């Protein structure tokens, strides 16, 4: 009833920023294309710049939206959200990590962008022992030949790909970067220096996403050859 009354008074008006100024911790949710794309100016000016404690749950991100088509396949949201000062950007890999990320987002003081896909993915984290920390990547497998940084649903795909690489004698280090901003700079540099070769895998444009975040770090601290696997948004 209260929600209905509010919608009658505030038709098509966002009130999350206002609630945050009153000490509430609002969570808003929509398709990533709308949460990050259509709403970018409002997120930037009403939430990001005043650093309000609003959490954005963006669903149906990436190309796995499938039959909803290109208009709903958001491949730019990470790039957009990374540019907003103080915005934390999290892209969980499975159900266990998603639950933990939501709790961590609630505890964090400041704006958080949580990126979720549409498709079900295999659960590979153990809920009883899993620990989530914003800004800390997770080494899923150590290796010496190449480092593969993955995020979101691409983490499970990367774990499977590693098994194929192993058959070819390639010892790959697999790292789950669930927090793209702030990225785990120490882990990125350490692993890149260890293997000397880096691959990034994401369900996002290769411009402005995980690959770009990794390259930003390595360009400054440990220049390394990087192959970015994602969606090529342009052909030139």
Which residues fall in each region the model found?
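Conserved protein kinase catalytic domain
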Residues: 10, 44-47, 215
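Structured loop/turn residues at beta-strand edges in well-structured enzyme cores
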Residues: 4, 52, 85, 193, ...
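Short, structured active-site "lid" loops
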Residues: 7, 27, 196-200
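Amphipathic, non-transmembrane alpha-helical secondary structure
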Residues: 13-14, 41-44, 99, 103, ...
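Thiamine diphosphate
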Residues: 65-66, 117-236
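Single conserved hydrophobic/aromatic residue that forms the stacking wall/gate
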Residues: 1-6, 10
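Conserved thiamine diphosphate
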Residues: 18-147, 156, 172
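Short acidic loop-to-helix transition motifs that present clustered carboxylates
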Residues: 11-13, 36, 95-98, 179-184
């Amino acid at each position: 009833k209260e929600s209905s009354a509010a919608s009658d008074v505030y038709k098509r008006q966002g009130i999350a920023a206002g609630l945050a100024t009153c000490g509430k911790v609002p969570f808003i949710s929509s398709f990533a294309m709308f949460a990050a794309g259509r709403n970018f100016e409002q997120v930037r000016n009403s939430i990001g710049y005043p650093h309000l404690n609003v959490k954005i749950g963006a669903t149906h991100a990436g190309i796995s939206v499938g039959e909803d088509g290109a208009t709903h396949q958001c491949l730019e949201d990470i790039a957009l959200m990374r540019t907003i000062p103080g915005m934390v950007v999290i892209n969980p890999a499975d159900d266990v990590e998603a639950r933990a990320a939501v709790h961590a987002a609630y505890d964090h003081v400041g704006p958080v962008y949580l990126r979720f896909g549409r498709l079900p993915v295999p659960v590979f984290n153990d809920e009883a022992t899993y620990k989530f920390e914003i800004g800390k990547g997770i080494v899923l497998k150590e290796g010496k030949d190449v480092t593969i940084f993955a995020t979101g649903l691409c983490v499970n795909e990367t774990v499977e790909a590693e098994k194929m690489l192993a058959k070819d004698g390639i010892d790959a280090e697999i790292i789950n970067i669930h927090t793209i901003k702030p990225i785990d700079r120490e882990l990125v540099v350490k692993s890149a220096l260890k293997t000397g070769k880096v691959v990034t895998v994401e369900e996002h444009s290769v411009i402005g996403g995980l690959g770009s975040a990794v390259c930003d770090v390595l360009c400054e601290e440990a220049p390394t050859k990087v192959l970015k696997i994602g969606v090529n948004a342009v052909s030139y």
